[in-house]
């Protein structure tokens, strides 16, 4: 499954990006998809992960985020999970 977290600030997004490098997980910072609203223009895409794994990583790394949702990620495109 694939998940996205959104951020209230660019600072939180940058912190998340730094933690991806320090505590690797299959994730990357991406421009926020058009179907989502957030305080900044970035989101973090977690690929091929379980929700509990994502939540655990977020908590362990003290990441400040707004929302966590499941998404479809195919051919480089992110769309909402129906």
Residue spans for each PLM region:
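Amphipathic, hydrophobic secondary-structure cores in small proteins
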Residues: 1, 10, 26-46
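C-terminal structural segments of small proteins and small subunits
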Residues: 48-82
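Short amphipathic alpha-helix segments
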Residues: 9-25
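Preference for short coil/turn "hinge" residues that link or interrupt alpha-helices
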Residues: 22-25, 29, 56, 61
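Residues that form or flank phosphate/diphosphate-binding pockets in enzymes
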Residues: 15, 39, 53
């Amino acid at each position: 499954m694939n998940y996205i977290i959104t951020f209230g600030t660019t600072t939180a997004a940058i912190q998340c990006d730094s933690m991806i490098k320090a505590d690797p997980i299959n994730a990357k910072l991406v421009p926020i998809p058009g179907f989502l609203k957030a305080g900044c223009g970035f989101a973090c895409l977690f690929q091929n992960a379980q929700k509990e794994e994502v939540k655990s990583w977020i908590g362990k790394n003290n990441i400040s985020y707004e929302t966590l949702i499941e998404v479809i990620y195919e051919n480089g495109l992110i769309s909402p999970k129906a």
